[in-house]
A protein has these predicted regions:
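Short amphipathic beta-strand and strand-loop transition segments with alternating hydrophobic
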Residues: 1-7
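N-terminal DNA-binding module of tyrosine recombinases/phage integrases
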Residues: 8-13, 18-111, 264-281
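N-terminal core-binding DNA-recognition domain of tyrosine site-specific recombinases/integrases
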Residues: 57-60, 72-154, 165-166, 186-188, ...
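Short, basic (Lys/Arg/His-rich) helix/loop patches that form interaction surfaces
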Residues: 123, 181-191, 201, 251, ...
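Basic, Lys/Arg- and aromatic-enriched nucleic-acid-binding interface segment
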Residues: 127, 131, 146-211, 218-219, ...
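Catalytic-site neighborhood detector that most strongly recognizes the C-terminal catalytic loop/helix
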Residues: 162, 166, 170, 228-231, ...
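C-terminal secondary-structure termini that scaffold catalytic or DNA-interacting sites
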Residues: 185, 220, 233-234, 238-248, ...
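Short, polar N-cap/turn motifs at the start of nucleic acid-interacting alpha helices
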Residues: 215-222, 314, 333-355, 363
Length: 381
């Protein structure tokens, strides 16, 4: 098997036989656009090698938009959680199809991707979000390889922008106490309990909102994280089991939180008795006046308002989780215990997320060691 080369204008192309068509006639593949004959010969040799190993796949001539919509509807819808599917769908329809949809699958080049990432950076989109889009496209291309629409994953040849690690925004203990003091004065006791549970346990927002009374052992001071709450775009709420086995966990809680939960339970029971049958009792620890889960949007609005009112550092709700972990590590708690409380896959993940805290602790350890050595010298003298 050999290739045939020709020069057209300033570029070289080659043609090679790739097999026989169903009618017995020769099937050929032509590739062009090479600056030199040497480049064309190299590409031709690689193609012939693939054909010889029966590894050559003719790239699909379908538009990326058609293939991506098929992937979204038939593959992702059946395999992803609703929350992940909705996020993927939004990114694909709003960002990726407008960018790459008109291009045929086999004609996408690294330069297309690089230019798109540059455009997104010019729009001031974060490296984290661009990396998220990159991950979606890599996954899409991986699927196209699996169903033999392409030979290789072009997104493996392009790097997304570098993500610079930022220090987690956390509250001091003084800020926590000031915020909780303001929250406790609010008419709606639910929000105060949400913040209290999040700060004292490190639970995620969906985990706090999905807690049921049967998940809490008030006698022994334990709570079980068994499910997560998600509100779909249509406004419906869903309860799911945690993503991983480690997320499904048992968390010890202090006596002060136990007492607050007991008070909250009494207030809730009083409300249920008062409103009667209109209360849809799902057994939730945190529920609105009708018994259904608090909407995350309502929580965000309340959180932002109370931050302003209590004059504390502006953070996200998720940063309460970081605050919990940071305080534990600063107190000298073993990283494995912190990892278990947070539901991380392993302690190395916790070390990576909170490396800035452990770095400070390393410096403190070095100082303590030096002080111990000085003390030893004094004793010897």
């Amino acid at each position: 098997m050999k290739g045939y080369f020709r020069k057209r204008g300033n570029t070289w192309s080659f043609t090679v036989d790739i097999g026989r068509k169903p009618d017995g006639s020769r099937e050929q593949k032509t590739k062009g656009g090479f600056k030199t004959k040497k480049e064309a010969e190299k590409a031709c040799a690689e193609l012939i090698t693939l054909i010889g190993r029966n590894n050559y796949i003719e790239p699909s001539k379908k538009a990326i938009s058609d293939l991506m919509l098929e992937w979204l509807d038939y593959q992702l819808k059946a395999t992803l959680r609703l929350s992940t599917y909705e996020n993927y769908s939004k990114a694909i329809l709003k960002r990726l199809i407008p960018a790459f949809g008109h291009v045929k699958l086999g004609e996408l080049k690294p330069v297309h991707i690089q230019k798109y990432y540059k455009r997104l950076q010019d729009e001031n989109l974060t490296p984290e979000y661009i990396t998220y889009l990159h991950a979606i496209m890599r996954s899409f291309m991986k699927y196209q390889i699996r169903i033999q629409n392409i030979q290789s994953n072009i997104f493996d040849l392009v790097d997304p922008p570098t993500i610079r690690k930022k220090e987690k925004a956390v509250w001091s203990i003084e800020e926590i106490n000031r915020f909780l003091s303001i929250a406790k004065e609010e008419k709606n006791h639910n929000f105060y309990m949400i913040y209290l549970i999040a700060i004292y346990t490190g639970l995620r927002r969906g985990e706090v909102l999905a807690l049921r009374w049967k998940d809490i052992d008030l006698t022994n001071g334990k709570l079980s994280v068994c499910q997560n709450l998600y509100y779909s775009k249509g406004g419906e709420f869903h309860f799911w089991e945690p993503k991983t086995g480690r997320s499904n966990r048992l968390v010890s809680i202090p006596e002060s939180l136990v007492k607050e939960l007991q008070v909250h339970k009494e207030l809730q029971q009083h409300h249920i008795t008062k409103v009667g049958e209109i209360y849809d009792d799902l057994g939730l620890v945190i529920a609105n006046e009708l018994g259904v889960p608090i909407h995350p949007r309502s929580l965000t609005d309340n959180f932002r308002r109370l931050i302003k009112k209590s004059n504390v550092t502006k953070i996200r709700f998720h940063d309460l989780r970081h605050t919990h972990a940071t305080i534990l590590l600063q107190l000298g708690e073993h990283v494995k215990i912190v990892s278990e409380r947070l539901g991380h896959s392993d302690a190395s993940m916790t070390m990576n997320v909170y490396s800035h805290v452990t770095r400070d602790m390393q410096e403190q350890t070095a100082r303590r060691f030096e002080e111990a050595m000085k003390l030893k010298k004094l004793i010897e003298f």
